[in-house]
């Protein structure tokens, strides 16, 4: 029995020894295990790599949004400039149409009508029941009167036409600088203070109301706050238009200056005209 037990133990040990032989290849198995674990570590480290494209995409979207906002603001400013230029050109067109209409009406009113006078005189002679001598004398008097009347109308029409042409040429001169704007503003202001009517003052000087409103900030700045002219600078026609210079003058009017302007407008020391610009 003891021999069997010893043999069994020996066989068991041998079997155990034989079973333990594969463990000598443990380094090979360890390398396989390490090789299998390596992809899992890579998978764990992948989320930070996947997060970087998202951040790049967000930054790109922000940049595109910023560019779109800048372009939108630029387009908005461009639209405002074009609208102001459209209003200015529309005012000039209305002014031209009204002046042409007034010229046509004045021409029709001042045009002499000799045929009508002759017809009236002949009708009077035909309807008369006096003798032939009286009719002939009456026709002679009427012809002399009509001739003198035509001559008087012709002289009157020529003088009035000359006077009207001078006024039209003087008033149609377009202002080209700040001094011209101020001079025109003071003329209209003096007429307004006499006539007590804005529309009649503009009609008297043959100037459109919107045209004056577009350049009003220049005149108000020169009258109320001439010290601010240093901030705005002198007008240079080679660098900017008069409309753009008027906008800069409007932006230079602070709250205190605007209060002074409103007070002077209420007392009729300035033209009570609204601005065409917005802050």
UniProtKB/Swiss-Prot annotation:
Subcellular location: Nucleus
Origin superkingdom: Eukaryota
Coiled-coil regions, chain positions: 62-101
Listed GO CC annotations: cytosol; nucleoplasm
Pfam families for this protein: CCDC106 (PF15794)
Modified residues (Phosphoserine): 129
Record keyword Coiled coil present: yes
Annotated signal sequence range: none
Compositional bias segments (type: Basic and acidic residues): 109-121
Entry keyword set: Coiled coil, Nucleus, Phosphoprotein
Motif Bipartite nuclear localization signal, residue range(s) on this chain: 151-164
The keyword Nucleus belongs to this UniProt entry's keyword annotation: yes
Ranges of compositional bias, category Basic residues: 151-167
Region spans: Disordered: 109-173
Subunit structure: Interacts with p53/TP53.
Function: Promotes the degradation of p53/TP53 protein and inhibits its transactivity.
Record's protein name: Coiled-coil domain-containing protein 106
Species this protein is from: Mus musculus (Mouse)
């Amino acid at each position: 029995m003891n021999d069997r037990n010893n043999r069994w133990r020996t066989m068991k040990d041998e079997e155990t020894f034989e079973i333990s032989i594969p463990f000598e290849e443990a380094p090979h198995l360890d390398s396989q295990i390490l090789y299998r674990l390596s992809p899992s570590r890579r998978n764990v480290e992948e989320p930070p790599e996947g997060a970087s494209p998202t951040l790049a995409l967000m930054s790109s979207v922000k940049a595109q949004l910023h560019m779109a906002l800048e372009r939108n603001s630029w387009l908005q400013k461009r639209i405002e400039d074009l609208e102001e230029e459209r209003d200015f050109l529309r005012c000039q067109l209305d002014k031209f149409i009204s002046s042409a209409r007034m010229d046509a009406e004045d021409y029709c009113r001042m045009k002499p009508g000799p045929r009508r006078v002759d017809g009236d005189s002949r009708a009077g002679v035909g309807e008369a029941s006096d003798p032939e001598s009286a009719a002939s004398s009456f026709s002679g008097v009427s012809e002399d009167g009509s001739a003198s009347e035509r001559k008087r109308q012709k002289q009157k029409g020529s003088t009035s036409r000359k006077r009207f042409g001078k006024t039209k040429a003087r008033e149609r001169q377009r202002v080209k600088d700040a001094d011209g704007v101020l001079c025109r503003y003071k003329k209209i202001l003096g007429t307004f203070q006499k006539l007590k009517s804005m529309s009649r003052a503009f009609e008297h000087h043959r100037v459109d109301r919107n045209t004056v409103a577009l350049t009003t900030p220049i005149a108000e700045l020169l009258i109320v706050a001439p010290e601010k002219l240093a901030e705005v600078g002198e007008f240079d026609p080679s660098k900017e238009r008069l409309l753009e210079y008027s906008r800069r003058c409007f932006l230079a009017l602070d709250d205190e200056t605007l209060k002074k302007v409103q007070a002077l407008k209420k007392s009729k020391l300035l033209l009570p005209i609204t601005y065409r610009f917005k802050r």
